[in-house]
Amino acid sequence: TAARFTNNFIHKPTNIEHDKEKIVGHIASAGFSEYGTNKIIGEESIKNLKKPFNIALGAVVYKSANKAFAMALQRSVDPEDSYHNKISASWEVGFTDYNLAVGSKKLSEARIITNEEEKEELKGRLKAYGGNGKTEKGESIYRLITGNIYPLGIGFTVNPAADVKGVFAPPEEYQT
């Protein structure tokens, strides 16, 4: 699924805290990286992968759109700054359906629920619907998006929903 839709992120807007009226740039590139190491990997590598990986998006931030945000983002990518990793990027994606992954973030270890009645029964436990992200037994529960998937952009945020922290820029980028 990821291989089919990732390139559709290109040219979509980036904003502050998912506020569509605070556009600060656009996505310029898309690819994949290993989960945990962030090593760039090719599209062919992920097609049959059974372990987590990242969708890696490159963006241009317009300093002229919001100079204070651009400066905060520069500080957030600088490992020497006290503000390091305070700002992260969070996907904005529309989708027509989802299944549930229960018990683990790793799909190879999760129980996948596709039955509509079971999904409806567990829906209120999802964080997206006000739940705590756990089943009655305390198992973690996640949405596994399916159907038609529509990349909409990125929200730069201090509180990402996904297991991500910070953004990356080459050292020469955060020195300017």
PLM feature spans:
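Signature of dsDNA virion morphogenesis modules
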Residues: T1-T176
